[in-house]
């Protein structure tokens, strides 16, 4: 349980990848982690749209959004001009706290069946960024309207 709390609070020293595998394999752990996120996250972006009744491939492409905004943060992406298939994911936090300047920020993307988590570098001048592959499932989840976002 302590590891779940540490991951929820954005501790970069926790082995997030291994812990997320355990969380996604256990409904009990997933529920506990979701409860912790709802209590401890400093910012959230809820599910953006209701599920479409179209086919699954059409629904997933229709559910893609280009940015997530809330009062606490903005998450957007820009394609890399030199390398096709790569994107810069930019996280802007206008009122970040000291922890985010030292440890960075963890973004948790949550649906009913899956939770993915990615750690961003420390905030500098109100923003941070990562270079990712467009095909990376974590990138896809961040900009899928059917995933809620929790920042810690």
Question: Which functions belong to the PLM regions below?
Answer:
Residues 8-11, 35, 45, 119, ...:
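Generic alpha-helix signal with a bias toward terminal, lower-confidence helices
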Residues 34-84:
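Transition segment at domain starts
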Residues 6-35:
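N-terminal amphipathic alpha-helical interaction or autoinhibitory segments
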Residues 29, 44-48, 116:
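Short alpha-helical interface elements
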């Amino acid at each position: 349980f302590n590891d779940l709390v540490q991951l929820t609070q954005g501790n970069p020293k926790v082995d997030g990848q291994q812990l997320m595998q355990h969380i996604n394999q256990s409904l009990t752990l997933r529920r506990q982690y979701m409860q912790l996120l709802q209590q401890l996250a400093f910012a959230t972006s809820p599910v953006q749209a209701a599920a479409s009744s179209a086919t699954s491939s059409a629904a997933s492409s229709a559910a893609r959004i280009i940015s997530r905004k809330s009062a606490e943060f903005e998450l957007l992406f820009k394609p890399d001009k030199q390398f096709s298939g790569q994107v810069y994911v930019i996280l802007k936090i206008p009122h970040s706290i000291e922890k985010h300047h030292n440890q960075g920020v963890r973004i948790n993307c949550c649906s009913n069946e899956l939770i993915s988590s990615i750690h961003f570098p420390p905030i500098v001048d109100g923003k941070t960024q990562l270079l990712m592959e467009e095909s990376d499932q974590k990138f896809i989840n961040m900009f899928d309207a059917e995933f809620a976002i929790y920042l810690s």
